[in-house]
Amino acid sequence: MATVIDTPTLEGRDLVDPALFKRLTDFCAAEYGLEACMAERIMDEGLAFLDTMGRSGEPLSPSRQVDPAWHTFMLHSAEYTEWCMQRYGRYMHHAPNSRYRDRSAMVDVTSRIRALGYDVDDSLWGVAAECNEPACCGDGPCC
């Protein structure tokens, strides 16, 4: 008889204090005009993304839908700086358009997030539709 071992999945929200997660989601909802449940999903994915990037030491790009989580956390600068320094020993800078957000990039990022044990909300990791010429996002309207 085979034994099935349930491995619990990690959640990004568990990387910060519950009170901070609430403040971040409330801000994200208000700043981006989102319903609370969507802001929670975005912040959860964003924190998992940041942990993946921090642990890898490599620059990664979030999806267009997850990017507001990074912006939200960075705007809470004291908490963000302390979190980065305590967890990774460095501040993680945000360089917009540091990497194209095409399908292959998002598959790479979500694969890395999953490899660390996080459950990925695939609906938030689509391809960005807004492109900055001359870059092409792969399947956006500018291509």
Question: What role is predicted for each listed range?
Answer:
Residues 1-143:
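Intrinsically disordered, low-complexity, repeat-rich regions
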